[in-house]
């Protein structure tokens, strides 16, 4: 199906936009929210007061060992907030610095499926995947295929 637009809509705006870019203020605290990870039962790997770097493991899923959530910022763990039945509400990090963990990874062409899965789990990228239809994090041993389909 092809759509052709014959006429557009000219909105009569007067003036021009300001040609400036505002610099945002630095963030003082960030939080990893437990509600972002449906069905995850965390085993905490850090405590309040611990120093973390970007990519430092914060907690791991009890039900799926190997599924790790990492720190989005470098700094100090300011608070670990729990709710009813000790459910994780948030892990608050007071931002200080920009140090990051280094992860060893191979060239994509030379890496095996297990190598890619291991790096994704260690770096915290695995939790970006979601299963359907409930939006949960996939188990650590899920077989992933990445190929072009028609």
Regions found by a protein language model. Give the residues of each.
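N-terminal, Lys/Arg-enriched amphipathic/low-complexity engagement segments
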Residues: 1-45
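Generic structural motif
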Residues: 25, 36-40, 52-55, 64, ...
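Acidic, glycine-anchored pre-beta loop/turn
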Residues: 46-52, 82-84
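Short hydrophobic beta/alpha edge segments that flank linear recognition/processing sites
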Residues: 53-66, 81, 89-97
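Glycine- and charge-enriched low-complexity intrinsically disordered segments
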Residues: 84-123
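Phosphate-interacting basic helix/loop segments used at nucleotide- and nucleic-acid interfaces
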Residues: 123-124, 130-134
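Glycine/charge-rich, flexible interdomain linkers and switch-proximal surface loops
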Residues: 135-140
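Conserved small/polar residues in nucleotide/adenosyl-binding loops
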Residues: 142-149
């Amino acid at each position: 199906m092809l759509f052709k637009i014959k006429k557009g809509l000219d909105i009569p705006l007067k003036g021009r936009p300001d040609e400036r870019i505002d610099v945002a203020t630095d963030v003082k605290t960030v939080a990893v929210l437990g509600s972002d990870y449906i069905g995850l039962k965390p085993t905490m790997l850090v405590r309040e007061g611990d120093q973390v770097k970007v990519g430092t493991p914060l907690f791991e899923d009890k039900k799926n060992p190997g599924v790790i959530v990492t720190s989005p910022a470098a700094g100090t763990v300011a608070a670990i907030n729990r709710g009813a039945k000790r459910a994780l509400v948030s892990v608050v990090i007071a931002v200080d610095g920009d140090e990051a963990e280094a992860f060893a990874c191979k060239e994509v062409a030379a890496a095996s499926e297990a190598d890619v899965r291991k790096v994704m789990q260690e770096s915290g990228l695995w939790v970006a995947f979601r299963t359907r239809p409930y939006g949960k994090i996939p188990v650590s041993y899920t077989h992933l295929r990445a190929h072009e389909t028609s």
